[in-house]
Each structure stands twice: as structure tokens, then as C-alpha cells.
Amino acid sequence: MPALPDNYGGNYVSSISARMEDHDDLELQGIVSRIRKDLTEFGEHYAKITQGGDISLAICKTVEDFGKMATSKDIDYYNCTSWCNFELYGADFGWGKPTWLSPVFTIKQKNVACLIDTRDGDGIEAWISLSPEDTALFESNKELLEFSAANPSVSV
């Protein structure tokens, strides 16, 4: 990735999309391999579009492309983000540290997962939003249930 200009301020966040076709290898190793490949290609593409040009235009184009992909009815879009190691439970803006953190999902969002450290730091919470059909499958996965607790209570 190229260095950002000296007069650039703020944070730049982007996403990497790994497009999987029906005939692609859908095993975990195949998916990880595809994400790594697409991450490399993203870096190369980003380097090209920002060289000598206006970085804000490159950012706008990236956001526009992502929006088209994420809202397409022809694509099953899955989004996973991790807030782990951000030490969010240590943040205090003057009214005290948070008791419990959660992402905000709308009713219409599906196929979204957000990983967050537990307050005590001994585990990870996975906040997941799925369609009703996928939720039923997810909640009946015996192997998954061995390692999880659905809807844990807030420990203060």
C-alpha cells in the first residue's frame, strides 16, 4: 500500500470482497485462500488508483462499488467484522466505562457477524444477524452449540 499524503487526516476503512461462485471450493481453506488473493489484488488496485491522483476520489469509488455489491439482489453478501483487541470496555467519555457493548443491526440486515471481546476479556461474543431460515439452521447446529451460549445475560 502506498503512503497516504501528508495532508490526509482521519481514518480510512475499507472492505475486501471475496466473490465466490457456486462451483468454487466452499471449504474453509478455499475461502481463506480466496480472501488472501483478493486482499493482495485490492492492495495492488488501491496503489494504482491513488498514485498521483486524488485519494478522496479513490475512496468514493471504493465506497460506491461496495454499496452496489452489498445491495445487489443477485449476490448473497456476508459481512464479518471484528472489534476484538480494541479495548472498548476501557473507554470512558466521562460517564463511566461501558457495561456491555453491542453492534447495531437493523431488521433488514442479514448475513452479518460482529466479534467483540467479552467484558472480562476471557471470551468473544459473536453478534450475528441472519434470515429466519438461516437462524433456525444456525441455532440447531450441535457442533456450534457445544462451544457457545445463546443470548447470555449481562454480567455487571
Language-model segments: residues:
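Acyl-CoA-dependent O-acyltransferases
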Residues: 1-156
